[in-house]
């Protein structure tokens, strides 16, 4: 992830690949480095920004919203929170209470016990089914670095790797590309599993070079800064081939790209 085995094993590998349910990599959208993008998570999308990629909330937007963006030639990423329970989502009752941990600093959100793969997998499968059925091209799974936070659970880096790989496989089984959100320490292990990266504030913390493995693999890095002005990070972003812009924290329509 060969003697008589040189003949038998390749055939067996092809047969198993055909039964796995995972879409071939070449059939998925693969965003390349440097693509401009819009990231809007506050309510339904405003389609007026002229960029090739939109990252929008999977619950708040409709089939018609995604179809309109496609008619305009856009690719569309489905934002889904996979690391925290949200009390404002229609499937909030699907999460067993023992899986809900500490509040994460955002209103109505609590960390999830991501060790419970068998419980969380069908919930996330239904969410990614929604993304696929609405016509999205990719998924942005949020909060995939709980092991570095006070979640209320003794999460380890190994727990996070297992969960993140499960999330990536759920997306790929549905023909969706998937992005690694932040989680810089695990890029070396997770690079083969993810099709692009989404990063917040790597310039503020002088960490943008850590995303270079994605760029070197021909995979886009969609990057935002909140507090830093473009004058402080765009030169490095262009050098590193990041898709960078400044946004306000509420992630509305406003953007200031490099």
Task: Label the model's feature ranges.
Residues 1, 21-22:
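Nucleic acid-interaction modules of nuclear/chromatin regulatory proteins and viral regulators
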């Amino acid at each position: 992830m060969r003697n008589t085995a040189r003949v038998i094993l390749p055939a067996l590998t092809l047969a198993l690949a055909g039964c796995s349910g995972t879409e071939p990599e070449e059939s998925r959208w693969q965003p390349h480095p440097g693509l401009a993008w819009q990231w809007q998570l506050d309510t339904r999308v405003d389609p007026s920004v002229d960029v090739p990629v939109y990252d929008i909330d999977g619950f708040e937007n409709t089939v018609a919203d995604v179809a309109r963006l496609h008619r305009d030639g856009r690719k569309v990423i489905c934002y889904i929170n996979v690391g925290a329970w949200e009390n404002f989502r229609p499937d909030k009752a699907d999460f067993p209470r023992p899986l809900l941990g500490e509040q994460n600093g955002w209103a109505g959100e609590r960390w999830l016990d991501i060790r419970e793969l068998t419980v969380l997998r069908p919930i996330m499968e239904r969410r990614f089914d929604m993304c696929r059925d609405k016509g999205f091209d990719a998924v942005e799974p949020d909060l995939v670095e709980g092991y570095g936070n006070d979640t209320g659970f003794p999460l380890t880096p190994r727990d996070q790797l297992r969960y993140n790989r499960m999330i990536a496989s759920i997306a790929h089984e549905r023909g969706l590309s998937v992005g690694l959100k932040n989680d810089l320490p695990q890029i070396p292990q997770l690079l083969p599993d993810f099709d692009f990266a989404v990063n917040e504030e790597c310039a503020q913390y002088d960490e943008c070079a850590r995303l270079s493995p994605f760029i070197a693999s021909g995979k886009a890095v969609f990057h935002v800064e909140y507090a830093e002005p473009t004058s402080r990070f765009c030169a490095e972003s262009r050098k590193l081939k990041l898709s960078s812009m400044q946004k306000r924290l509420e992630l509305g329509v406003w953007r200031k790209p490099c």
